UniProtKB/Swiss-Prot annotation:
InterPro entries: DUF4939 (IPR032549)
Family in the record: Belongs to the FAM127 family.
More about this protein: RTL8C is one of at least 11 genes called Mar or Mart related to long terminal repeat retrotransposons. They do not correspond to functional retrotransposons, but rather to neofunctionalized retrotransposons genes.
Pfam families, alphabetized: DUF4939
Taxonomic classification: Eukaryota, Metazoa, Chordata, Craniata, Vertebrata
The name this protein goes by in its record: Retrotransposon Gag-like protein 8
Organism name: Bos taurus
Amino acid sequence: MDGRVQLIKALLALPIRPQTRRWRNPIPFPETFDGDTDRLPEFIVQTGAYMLVDENLFTNDALKVTFLITRMTGPALQWVIPYIRKQSPLLNDYRGFLAEMKRVFGWVEDEDF
């Protein structure tokens, strides 16, 4: 018991580090995407803006694609599961992944967009 008391006293005597605040992304956290074609442009803009502002976190294509996947639900999530299972190269290609999403979910871009 005496050893525990000494250990607790020693731990309490250690200098306390000031708590550092984690940087907070000013862009609202993106809403989820369920495969609704009408919401796809909004989803891409929301996730893209969120990642752009926090470039220190989203440093490569794999992290960007992974972030998109974490925001998917329903049919969109079901669509991506086979890509994950077969470890598709698209999971490491952000632009390619976006192009495939647009193709699958039927978004035809206007040249003005």
